[in-house]
A protein has these predicted regions:
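Active-site entrance/lid segments in N-terminal catalytic domains of soluble metabolic enzymes
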Residues: 2-12, 16-34, 38-39, 59-61, ...
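Short, intrinsically disordered, charge-balanced linker/junction segments flanking boundaries
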Residues: 321-325
Length: 325
């Protein structure tokens, strides 16, 4: 199995999806019987957008490829936290880096794609989800009922670089990007050739909004001081004008509480380093930061919130994964 992840052109993804559905009644290996069809028009609003269900995949391997976003939609996901991008997008990551015996472990925080490649994947996924909704009649709403949420990291200096800034601005409005225009062209060609069931008007391709995401979930490194986290959030809210969530870690609860929870739930084999809790943000500091940023978000006309929970640093036994933590 190759450890190099190579992007697939949108037209090839579309052909794969259509051929598999026609021949096997499955899409990206998900059988039709497992597709989730919304049976009513109920939804909630977040970031000024409609969202049909309160579930979806968190940032990670499950959201870094276009076909994974399509699969998540097919199985009921409607809020998609896209995998985190950062300025260091060409790191050599020792493999394997993920292990899920029951609870999940990972030893890396990079992406397998460069930032421009990740951007392209998210645009392709955006189109695939729109196509599936229209083709299969999955939603009962007359307008979009799902939300794409960016995730960026890990410090202000990196987030301000042209590479990450272009990523953010591109997902806010992708209309002028090469990949968005390519997807429109390829989708129109497929519609005009009669390849897509239940979609016959090529104008459908033009109806897909280029405004893919107006929100960001911020990811920072363990041990990042509260004032630095708040500074990044203020930049995203005040300068980028995006709805902002920040990921907070279980270390806020303190070592003794987390240890007790693990032991009570029979996860006593998980080992933690108490020093990890000493270096991370404290609960009282988090409360102050949240109050400050909620007020700042209101001043700027955007929402601020937190994601609970992000990752927890644990001691690696070294049996299956590299690195010590």
């Amino acid at each position: 199995m190759s450890d190099v992840m190579r992007p697939i052109k949108f037209k090839h993804l579309l052909r794969w999806m259509l051929d598999e559905y026609a021949s096997q009644k499955s899409i990206f290996s998900i059988p039709e019987g497992k597709f989730y069809y919304k049976k009513d028009k109920a939804y909630f609003e977040i970031f000024g957008e409609k969202c049909e269900t309160a579930i979806g995949p968190a940032a990670g391997p499950a959201t870094q490829q276009a076909m994974n976003l399509a699969v998540s939609y097919l199985t009921g996901g409607r809020f998609f936290e896209l995998k985190t991008v950062q300025i260091l997008d060409a790191l050599e990551v020792e493999k394997p880096c993920i292990d899920i015996p029951d609870e999940g472990y990972n030893t890396e925080w990079s992406t397998e794609f460069s930032v421009p490649e990740a951007f392209d994947e998210y645009v392709k996924g955006w189109f695939l989800v729109h196509i599936l909704d229209k083709m299969l009649g999955i939603s009962q709403l007359d307008e979009r009922g799902f939300v794409f949420n960016m995730s960026v990291g890990y410090d202000l200096e990196g987030i301000k670089t042209p590479k990450i800034d272009n990523f953010i601005e591109g997902l806010k409005d992708a209309s002028e990007t090469e990949i968005f225009q390519e997807c429109v062209r390829d989708l129109k060609a497929a519609i005009e050739s009669g390849e897509i069931p239940n979609i016959s008007d090529a104008a459908f391709a033009d109806s897909i909004s280029p405004k893919i995401s107006n929100s960001i979930t911020l990811s920072t490194m363990h041990g990042t001081p509260p004032d630095e986290q708040e500074g990044i959030c203020r930049y995203l809210i005040g300068e980028k004008k995006v709805h902002t969530f920040v990921k907070l870690n279980p270390t806020l609860l303190g070592y003794d509480y987390v240890r007790n929870v693990f032991d009570q739930q029979e996860f006593d084999h998980i080992e933690m380093n108490p020093e990890s809790f000493e270096h991370d943000m404290k609960y009282d500091d988090a409360v102050k930061m949240i109050a400050s940023l909620k007020a700042f978000g209101k001043e700027n006309g955007v929402q601020f919130g937190v994601k609970l929970t992000n990752t927890l640093a644990v001691i690696n036994d070294g049996r299956r994964l590299p690195t010590g933590e």
